[in-house]
Amino acid sequence: MFKQNEKAIAQIADYIPRACRGMQLQEAKARLEKKIALYIDDGCDAAVLNAAFAPALNSHTRESFFSCIAAQIRKGGNQ
C-alpha cells in the first residue's frame, strides 16, 4: 500500500504541471482534486494523498500552487 501511495503521488505530481499549464488557479486546483479522488477510488490512502497535496490545494497563487507540486516531484513522492 505504501508503494502504491508513493507511486500515486509521483504520478499526480508529474501530471498536474503538464495538464494545468494554461489554467487559472481554481481550475488547476479542481483538476488536482479530481485526480486525487481517482487515485483514492483506485485504493490509495486518502489521508496520505490529501496530506501530500494540501499545501498546493491551500495555495493562493498559481506560482505557489505549482511550486508545491514541484516540491512533491523533488521529494519523489516520499512522505
Regions found by a protein language model. Name each.
Residues 4, 55, 67-68:
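Generic detector of N-terminal low-structure segments
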Residues 2-31:
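N-terminal acidic leader/helix
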Residues 25-63:
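Acidic, low-complexity, intrinsically disordered interaction modules
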Residues 11, 22, 33-35, 66, ...:
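General helical structural elements
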Residues 14-17, 21, 41, 45, ...:
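Intrinsic disorder/low-complexity segments
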Residues 1-7, 71-79:
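Short intrinsically disordered terminal tails
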